[in-house]
Amino acid sequence: MVQVLNAQGELGKEDIRSNYVTFLASLFRSMRFSAADAHGRANIAAFNFLQRMGAFTRDSATGRYRVDFDKFRAGSDSLAATILKFQGDGDYAGVGEFQKSFGVVTALAQADLARLAALKIPVDVIFDQGQP
């Protein structure tokens, strides 16, 4: 979907690959603070789906993630098609099976989340507007 906006020039001169990297980072961020709500579970499923599609890999020595841009595009297209099909068909049971397959934080991802928590990186920024 973002590829269409990019092809139409709606994203300016930005390299489309930065959108893929940002999306992956946002999935990881979401898993840190909202794994229990619907938004968090959807992002966990997206993360696991894209990982299974080879959209990114994790270096076991460093714990760092690397995006495969071609596979990320194919994976995100496949994820969007899967979700749209579930919605269009009203396939509630299919969504349940999808969530069973992809909607769980893996032990490896949980270890990476714990590593982030140990670094005390803030989960969210709070902005107070106006006078106290």
PLM segments and residue spans:
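Long, well-structured alpha-helical subdomains associated
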Residues: 3-99
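Extended, compositionally biased alpha-helical segments that mediate assembly or anchoring
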Residues: 85-132
